[in-house]
């Protein structure tokens, strides 16, 4: 087992728990915010087990997923905007619960939690299908176009999973106000996709043909 990789993964995992916990519970002013605990559970429990599986079976893939440093200025801006949206959404959700502004019914929260878990399953399938998947936009040595499985339906199934994941999170937190804020993620990710397709079409053999054969980017028949 790669102890360095394990250490890096654990540090990022624990830092993520601490960061999300602060963003959710500090504005809420209480640990009684059960929707916050639900989000922590559906977010970090599957993440923990996925990390163990990747560490054991696909350490190179885990290493790529841990690397979030973008090289291009445009993508750095996309990452910064995404971080701002997350911060505003989580803080607003905590304040929404604390001051009882507009709380969603429990059935909506649990339905959103189920959608979140579904998005994790989609994400796991994408990781299984594409060994070249990284968090940064780049063309890797020996990379090939993947056009089977989910990639035969949409060109960016990872973003299909993340759109479901990110839009369901504020609903898990019971905050429609946070959901409205998180809708800003759609134009942000659209900007990232445009840039990514430019990079791939210029640097990855066969990608232009793939774009012609698979029409939809993220959501079948819609986007």
Describe the predicted segments one by one.
Residues 152-160:
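Histidine-centered phosphotransfer motif of kinases
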Residues 1-148, 160-223:
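Membrane-anchoring alpha-helices and their flanking helix-loop junctions
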């Amino acid at each position: 087992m790669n102890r360095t990789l394990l250490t890096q993964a654990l540090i990022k995992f624990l830092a993520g728990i601490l960061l999300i916990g602060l963003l959710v519970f500090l504005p809420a002013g209480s640990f009684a915010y059960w929707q916050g605990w639900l989000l922590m559970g559906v977010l970090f429990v599957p993440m923990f087990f996925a990390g163990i599986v990747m560490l054991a079976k696909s350490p190179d893939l885990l290493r790529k997923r841990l690397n979030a440093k973008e090289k291009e200025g445009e993508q750095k801006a996309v990452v910064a905007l995404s971080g701002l949206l997350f911060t505003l959404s989580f803080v607003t959700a905590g304040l929404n619960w604390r001051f009882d502004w507009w709380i969603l019914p429990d059935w909506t929260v649990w339905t959103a939690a189920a959608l979140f878990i579904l998005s994790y399953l989609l994400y796991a399938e994408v990781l299984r299908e594409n060994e070249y998947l990284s968090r940064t936009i780049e063309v890797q040595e020996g990379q090939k176009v993947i056009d089977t499985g989910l990639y035969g339906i949409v060109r960016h199934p990872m973003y299909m999973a993340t759109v479901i994941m990110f839009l369901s999170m504020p609903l898990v937190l019971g905050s429609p106000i946070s959901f409205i804020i998180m809708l800003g993620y759609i134009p942000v990710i659209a900007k990232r996709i445009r840039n990514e397709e430019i990079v791939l079409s210029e640097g990855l053999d066969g990608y232009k043909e793939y774009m012609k054969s698979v029409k939809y980017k993220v959501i079948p028949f819609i986007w």
